């Protein structure tokens, strides 16, 4: 299992390499394509501090504002300080620090997800866009029963789901899950993460939700892939539900956990069962939900 790495995106970014040298800033960079890594060549801490907003402590991007005394501020924080310099309290006006903007344009920085495996070096003004799409960026916790803010790589999240959310773990590519609810009419909007499956060396999450589709109460079951969307397309799955001699079958491609469970649900990308049909499948007097969901995961050739 790969080593666990955890990133807390709520704090400010820190780049702390083993050896620090000043980067050559004589070349303006406008190409978003990553450059080959340059060992031990990074922006000095003093330059990074110059580009740090004194209010939000984030990296500054054009327009970078300055007061008459030369103190700088990012454009996002300017309205928050009511046009007063947070350092000297002088009026800010509309002075831009063009020199600092040009210095920033000439810098190259490593992706903040380098500890996850990204080796690219990016121009300063392209770095944020890359990081928002970086294939090595951490995944958000896929647990759908509550709003969980944990993020990390896949091995970390698997352990987190097992230990912290007590999600059932299952080895194998076929499954047979029975869902029972004594009073299904009480459940209008609810979500459950039933099981995490391990097969083909990958992990898949089975979700089951109750929600309103227009005026009709329905259930939806779907599978999400614990990995990137490109990898998810290598797999397919089927879900089957039925009873009293009838059955419904769904076949599809698992969605990546990059897509939230709400996004998958709202796109109706799964097996949808109307509550009346689910109660019919349950048999009896249709007062208790007893729904058996079976399924299979396979790898496309």
Swiss-Prot record:
It is an enzyme of class 2 (transferase). PROSITE patterns: ZF_RING_2 (PS50089), ZF_SIAH (PS51081). Gene3D superfamilies: Apoptosis, Tumor Necrosis Factor Receptor Associated Protein 2, Chain A (2.60.210.10), Zinc/RING finger domain, C3HC4 (zinc finger) (3.30.40.10). It catalyses: S-ubiquitinyl-[E2 ubiquitin-conjugating enzyme]-L-cysteine + [acceptor protein]-L-lysine = [E2 ubiquitin-conjugating enzyme]-L-cysteine + N(6)-ubiquitinyl-[acceptor protein]-L-lysine. A zinc finger (SIAH-type) spans 106-166. InterPro entries: 7-in-absentia-prot_TRAF-dom, E3_ubiquitin-ligase_SINA, Sina-like_RING, TRAF-like, Znf_RING, Znf_RING/FYVE/PHD, Znf_SIAH. Changing residue 71 to Y: Loss of E3 ligase activity. A zinc finger (RING-type) spans 53-89. One of its GO terms (biological process) is protein ubiquitination. It holds the Pfam family Sina_TRAF. GO terms for molecular function: ubiquitin protein ligase activity; zinc ion binding. Induction: Induced by drought stress. Keywords: Cytoplasm, Metal-binding, Nucleus, Stress response, Transferase, Ubl conjugation pathway, Zinc, Zinc-finger. GO terms for cellular component: cytoplasm; nucleus. It comes from the Eukaryota. The RING-type zinc finger domain is essential for ubiquitin ligase activity. Plants overexpressing DIS1 exhibit reduced drought tolerance. Plants silencing DIS1 show enhanced drought tolerance. Belongs to the SINA (Seven in absentia) family. This is E3 ubiquitin-protein ligase DIS1. It comes from Oryza sativa subsp. japonica. The lineage of its organism: Eukaryota, Viridiplantae, Streptophyta, Embryophyta, Tracheophyta.
